[in-house]
Amino acid sequence: MSSDSVVAGNISRADVERVVRAVLTRQLAGATTSSGSVSSAGGPPNPLVVNISARHVHLTEEHVEVLFGKGVKLEPMKWLYQDGYYAAKQTVTIFGPRRRMIPDVRVLGPCRNASQVELAFTDGISLGIDLPVRISGDHHDTVGCVLVGPAGVVELKSGVIRAMRHVHMSPADCAYYGVKNGDEMDLKIHSGPCTTTLEHVTVREDKDVKLEVHIDTDEGNAVDLSHATKVELVKPVGCGCHSK
């Protein structure tokens, strides 16, 4: 019998706990979860997690009532990785300028001060919208769309964006990587023959966040994130062309 084998009749609770701990430790060293996200541990103060941010909508309280009815509040359906944030039960239909639509787009909570629609590049093609790449909240020179809910319609004049890929970092994470809010990093995704580096990952620093990278569905598919075995954040190094 192999030294790695365990006889079922003699296994104890301690043996089970030891095996489970060993498996979890190996998985945290770089494993893909069922949700398509990837985590990588070892080194930084917090484990690095990369998640795909699918198309979604952020709404003001006023727009929630217009779309879903007076007095209606967003109802959490699934809690997200960042504490306090969730995918709501409510969804809307998005109409673009060519009267093309995308139905059942999830609303994320909690509510914001300004409504915003975040789409992938291919979503923009479907709707006939030339999506500008923006950090969340930057609606300068952005287009609008029409949101339709079960109780009403909201016409947004602006706020439809393709979210710039970014990483949420705490002050401790920033100190570890030697970066600050607004800096850019590189994300290396090891995924078999499809190992890829995504540049220009913008740092978003906040004291109350977990270390997490957000990329959109197009980017996640391009790097084959669902099969990734390891992810790394790297501070870009200049080429030295202008150094003395």
Swiss-Prot record:
Zn(2+) 1 binds at H56, H58, E118. InterPro entries: PTAC. CoA binds at I52, S53, A54, R106, N221. Signal peptide: none annotated. Zn(2+) 2 binds at H166, H168, H214. It catalyses: propanoyl-CoA + phosphate = propanoyl phosphate + CoA. Part of a bacterial microcompartment (BMC) locus required for growth on plant and algal sugars, including L-fucose and L-rhamnose. Thought to be active on lactyl-CoA in a lactaldehyde-degradation pathway. CoA is regenerated within the BMC via this enzyme, although there must also be cofactor transport across the BMC. Directly targeted to the BMC. Full-length protein forms large oligomers. Possible homotrimer and monomer, when purified in the absence of the encapsulation peptide (EP, residues 1-20). The EP may influence oligomerization. Belongs to the PduL family. Formed by 2 beta-barrels, each is capped on both ends by short alpha-helices. This is Phosphate propanoyltransferase. The lineage of its organism: Bacteria, Pseudomonadati, Planctomycetota, Planctomycetia, Planctomycetales.
